[in-house]
């Protein structure tokens, strides 16, 4: 198998929604094209992660552009589609040059593929129908002529299209009834003939020698032969699905048994010598792995985070599957009370691959895919401490990507939002838990009239629109046409980091605390790289999701700067105990003042939510910090971790590390925890 890469690029992929309840979301994946497969992988920190899916080149039937939807966001301006035997994949390139390159490379590789489409759908499949023709079935015939078809279909290498030799036991049917005189079912019928002696295949004209022949109507799913013989078995060939191989059955007690087990319907017409057998539509055994569709898959969650979530569940056999630190590998994390431990124990089982590329946890039980492996072990422990009983999900009813209205604001319909309960309150109003369209959980920040100027409101909304990162709270839209104004964001179920530390901190390991700091650092590194200053980074302004991922929130004071520096107006309120010296002396903000605040946040995390400088008021803090006083080492922080947070508190901003440098310092401390 040729695994040499032809083309690699980070592209945006739309979920295929193979299940009715699957979310319609968009994710960046590293796409890799080889001679045999188009695969896509997770990609993080310049490293290829686990494979998320793969399509065999020989199964691809069409590759073409897709017409843009109305009000398409900037990042989805260059879509193309890949139609293959088992589905439809939409991919978005970053520019026209990239899209053209992928179309050219893919069309080159699928040249001569069987069953290329003459027509395709030029519009997206959205909300249960194609936008181009309004057909509601994803497998519906295309409505637009595919211009590339003629070139890709006719330029076929003879060797590539030659039928492989059938086994010797293939049944020969004497050509007693001329094929051309048979009742042809329809123009869409594909006629295949195979000469078992000359090893050649023919089109509609029959050869002179005896042939094994089969005729298949791809619309009605019927197969036509020359004589009704129920000791025969008609098998669709893997390489040419509309061609059928005719075999003698090895044994059968009666023709009725064979008929009942191999056909749904049989119609015999002896006057025309035509057989019509209906077969159920076959399904591919090589199912594409889309693990994100399964509740038990947690993705890039760490070992310590998985242990915390499983212990919170506290049920015998609670489990999840996560990406291993070894690229492309998976780990099953499983909770049990079987061991003499009051808290229970969590075991981590690596998913191994044998010489035949089968997956297993216990060597005697091997499977083609992760879902099949998990299904088996949900019923059999097979060497594990207990069987997999209760999947622990890290997924929630998240909102699909927002739909831009094209004017820089996402305006949502107020009547589509139902307010459920108050989550908290602040200087500008209250935050409520809500349901959007009766389905999706959202947080609604309700801005009281007069509490925020219109300019301030649009400043915060526009800032949030520009920021999209897994470690930043997602912005969904606004309701700005009447008061109270709504700012609608992602709902984060475990609330603010500060409260979580105070209520759950005693059950957290130092490695889990470090993971929380790393999450925040990732979000801040993103802001830093896009020249945004947060100005109010603290544990109270970060939120903890149900998978224990921590996300940076509260962008009310965030500013975009051209030179990494912002001077605030006199009289502006700021959080003194989280502020760098240049802030409380000169009102001067930069990403390095955010770094100072991050050091304070790390201290909050490792002290489980204590108030920094708790013995001093604000004026005393200004004096102490100006004199060189710094916070002490929390007892849960190692010397190495304390050195990292202490480096954030250098008096000179230029001597403090960047967030990217902080990530590099924390990463080695996480490595031992990721197995």
From Swiss-Prot:
UniProt-listed CDD domains: PH_Btk, PTKc_Btk_Bmx, SH2_Tec_Bmx
Induction: Activated by IL6/interleukin-6 through phosphatidylinositol 3-kinase (PI3-kinase) pathway. It is likely that activation occurs through binding of phosphoinositides to the PH domain.
Family matches, as Pfam families: BTK (PF00779), PH (PF00169), PK_Tyr_Ser-Thr (PF07714), SH2 (PF00017)
Cofactor note: Binds 1 zinc ion per subunit.
Residues reported in the UniProt entry to bind ATP: 423-431, 445
EC primary class: transferase
Cofactor(s) needed: Zn(2+)
Alphabetized UniProt keyword annotations: Apoptosis, ATP-binding, Cell adhesion, Cytoplasm, Kinase, Metal-binding, Nucleotide-binding, Phosphoprotein, SH2 domain, Stress response, Transferase, Tyrosine-protein kinase, Zinc, Zinc-finger
Function: Non-receptor tyrosine kinase that plays central but diverse modulatory roles in various signaling processes involved in the regulation of actin reorganization, cell migration, cell proliferation and survival, cell adhesion, and apoptosis. Participates in signal transduction stimulated by growth factor receptors, cytokine receptors, G-protein coupled receptors, antigen receptors and integrins. Induces tyrosine phosphorylation of BCAR1 in response to integrin regulation.
Protein name per UniProt: Cytoplasmic tyrosine-protein kinase BMX
Organism: Homo sapiens (Human)
Organism lineage string: Eukaryota, Metazoa, Chordata, Craniata, Vertebrata
Gene that specifies this protein: BMX
